[in-house]
Amino acid sequence: GLSAIYAAESGANWALASLRQGPVENKERTISLDGREARVRISSVTKEGNTWKGKISSDGVDLQTKAMRFVKITFTVEDGGERKIMVESVASDR
């Protein structure tokens, strides 16, 4: 249901925000709130010069109904003084 969608999208937003503010590296986090959970991974990070590429996957679940939703994003981050995040592709699945 909607709770799983919100959880997955919230996890993806957390990952994008962490790319803007913190180091661009592989990381994993579980976020729980109000009966929803998002398992978020930033993976396959590669760096060439001032550019990083990688993948975000966020698996959202409604802990009561067990409904699940998956969001996958490929991204590029350029850091030439001001960090820019570009989303290359987005996929969402149940």
Regions found by a protein language model. Give the residues of each.
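Conserved functional hotspots that engage anionic ligands or polymers and/or phospholipid headgroups
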Residues: 1-94
